[in-house]
Amino acid sequence: MNSRTLEIRRAALSAGLLALVLLVVAGIYLGWSRGFREEPQPAWVFESAESRFKYGSIGAEHDAGVPYWIFYVLPRVFPEKFRQDGKVAPGGYAALGVAWEQGQELPVGFTRKTIGFARVANNCAACHTTSYRTSPDSNPVFVVGGPGHTVNIENFFRLLIDCARDPRFNADILMAEIDRVTDLDIIDRLLYRFVIIPITKKRLLEREAQFAWIYRSDFPDWGRGRDDGMNLTRYFMIRAPMDDAFGPADIPAVWNLGKYHAETGQLPNYAGDTHDVHSVMVDSALGVLGAAPANKADFLAQVKWLQDYLSNLPPPKYPFPIDAARAAAGKPVFDAHCAACHASPRTGTRLPLAEVGTDKGRLDTWNKDAAIKANRIVAGMGIDRRGLVEEDLPGYKIPFLDGIWLRGPYLHNGSVPTLRDLLEPAADRPKAFWRGYDVFDPVKVGFVTEGEGAKQVGTRMDTTQRGSGNQGHEFGTTLGRADKEALVEYLKTL
């Protein structure tokens, strides 16, 4: 073999190796670009603090995100799964009772972010945004930081699993529907068909075992505006075995969190089960992520921003006229019958169950052992926080009453529809009512819970069911009618 031929072969080999290297590099880049490349959200999301709270990512797209185009077409492929039986409420995701601003592609609390491909996840606003209307014909007002009394969280959890279990959740059917609404390029089409759809189905079905308890026939539905938060922590964070504990609670308001002062014994959460607001923010955000954060520094920065924002977020002002004279008459009634708990050093501390007498289901879902395990898991992530209180829970926290007019239904489990009903003995309170309707009742102070409108969108609250008892807190029940009405008028001012 002459030197010329050898040089040609060497050149060809070098060119071939170079081409192979370039091909490998291109493949790696393509895989990174289409699978992992993270893009910032659009600038409009961050134009205001409120917009960021509503639509800003907290990092949940990494592990809990649903591919955007799958999320988009699920209501088209499975329309029957998005409807409540016998209801004429809107279909699609609106049927879940989410707050949805006109002109937005996604509901409040649903975030869109590209990590290789566009994904949809949730943030805190999905549960902590209140919708109210001043009349059936008026447009909704959305109040960030308020309790999401209309949202049906349990149905959302079930919905994703139920869709994944359906034989129609396959590449042929989903891709046919995706093709009707968008024009993916060839690479994305192949990724969706052979990678994204199969993996999404697999991961949703993997959640089924962890969510088995929400399918139990002996557990009542949570209904709109409630969740079983401590059981979610037990089954997802510490992977506890399923037991019979059941304690649904109203989604709380999270405005004005700066009012809590841990050094004086004021504890957040319904049962005072967490040492301070920072710990609540960390644990709640971890719950939304569903896994350890992909980027711990970014996660903690998001938590700090949320805590600062919510600590300084004021409660909403009452939107209807207030009878000033009646409210003034209600102030001494409040001072005599309510202030010792709700406007004193006791506020934010625990009241023993024997003293308040309310439903104990929420207390039964948490204990010292669970707190120790949860604290150990978070510490293992390298996250520093004071954490959950490592003791059994003796009672419920005495709540602050800021913005109390918009926090119905009342008691920790939402078993009393209005403030006026709360001033009646337990035996005289409504035994059942519709919850999740957003038309406000300015007379009784709460939401309208009866009538055709409430029936068509609401879920039925039956206070004889487990975890939903309306007993207890029989304070002010012996007041005269005039004093009760004056007290309710005063509470509108808080």
What are the roles of these predicted feature ranges?
Residues 1-8:
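N-terminal Lys/Arg-rich, disordered targeting/topogenic segments
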Residues 9-18, 23-494:
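Periplasmic c-type cytochrome electron-transfer domains
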